[in-house]
Amino acid sequence: MTIRKSNPYLSLVNSYLMDSPQPSSMNYWWNVGSLLGLCLVMQMASGMFLAMHYSSSMELAFNSVEHMMRDVNAGWLMRYIHANGASFFFMCLYLHMGKALYYGSYKSPRVLVWSMGVMMFMLTMATAFMGYCLVYGQMSHWGATVITNLLSAMPFMGGDLVPFIWGGFSVSNPTMQRFFALHYLLPFILAALVVMHFMALHVHGSSNPMGMSGNMDRLPMHGYFVFKDLMTVFVFILMFSLFVFYSPNTLGHSDNYMPANPMVTPPSIVPEWYLLPFYAMLRSMPDKLGGVMAMFAALLMLLMLPMTDRSVMRGNTFKMLSKLSFYLFLFNFFLLMNMGQLHVEVPFIELGQFATVYYFSYFLMLVPVMSSMENMLFYMGNK
């Protein structure tokens, strides 16, 4: 017996990454999971080096970032890898979740895998938000002020919760130090959730584009899908390098290159692009509490999907009605992303409200209705 099978530690790696049987029909959409693992390792490694030179003091935070850019050997490279890596991380996250929505990877028996993935998504959003605040530029300060102020909408305890998070009466030095401590800690919790995600996936194995059992035709992970993953890894590194070396600030915000000034409000307070859809839902509600509830409910909708999808078939490969509603949902998501960066004025307010209504209608109405109609067509076709 080879050492990779006899060693108690290597045997775990072998069963998960080498001899793990995978459906032979898996296409390139299943490669995004390996890209997410690469992004996580890349973010943790670059973040560790940045933390060696970063100061979480409010007076020194912005200057310490500039010090990395100008005086630290390859500091600019680490900073741009970390900043653009966050954007590419969310690109891969949205692609991975879109694949799961289209191919029905959330359905039984993989409900736990999907639930763990949604929790990882929410934790990644929290980590990214706190990391964005640590630069302590103009947009970072006001983004931290606006988002933390949302908690004041909570009944009874909101007014006390916000000063507790701030560590004072406004975003100040204790806030920055708390955000830095949490931003350093949360990726390790995320890595633990990734392991749990792997464990849940290993029970029933990966799904496939056909939406049926792949037990009849499976191939080992190593030798087939490992080299297939390497193809997308090389493409990812090429695209990532183009941004890091040639256009490092395209995915950022120019206002964040100005030191934070609590006395001057930016013309518009806009988060990073990957948070814009949920920020658009927040802004589309005329009531503060309603906006906060809509933003958090939009995330919780993802957890309800295994219960609202009543289809007897997994995925949208052979379902035209569900395929059409999914493409409309995709267009609506990009519309929300665009609405989140525009000024709060007519007609963008109404467009954001319509897009928010469709987002919730997709999960609460379209998916159950379409799946029930397609079940009827399926049973009628079998008679």
Curated annotation (Swiss-Prot):
The chain crosses the membrane at residues 32-52, 76-98, 113-133, 179-199, 225-245, 289-309, 321-341, 348-368. A ubiquinone binds at residue 202. Its main location: mitochondrion. Binds 2 heme b groups non-covalently. One of its GO terms (molecular function) is ubiquinol-cytochrome-c reductase activity. Its cofactor is heme b. It comes from the Eukaryota. Heme b b566 binds at residues 96, 197. One of its GO terms (cellular component) is respiratory chain complex III. It is a multi-pass membrane protein. It holds the Pfam family Cytochrom_B_C. Keywords: Electron transport, Heme, Iron, Membrane, Metal-binding, Mitochondrion, Mitochondrion inner membrane, Respiratory chain, Transmembrane, Transmembrane helix, Transport, Ubiquinone. Heme b b562 binds at residues 82, 183. PANTHER family: CYTOCHROME B. Belongs to the cytochrome b family. Component of the ubiquinol-cytochrome c reductase complex (complex III or cytochrome b-c1 complex) that is part of the mitochondrial respiratory chain. The b-c1 complex mediates electron transfer from ubiquinol to cytochrome c. Contributes to the generation of a proton gradient across the mitochondrial membrane that is then used for ATP synthesis. Fungal cytochrome b-c1 complex contains 10 subunits; 3 respiratory subunits, 2 core proteins and 5 low-molecular weight proteins. Cytochrome b-c1 complex is a homodimer. This is Cytochrome b. It comes from Debaryomyces hansenii (strain ATCC 36239 / CBS 767 / BCRC 21394 / JCM 1990 / NBRC 0083 / IGC 2968).
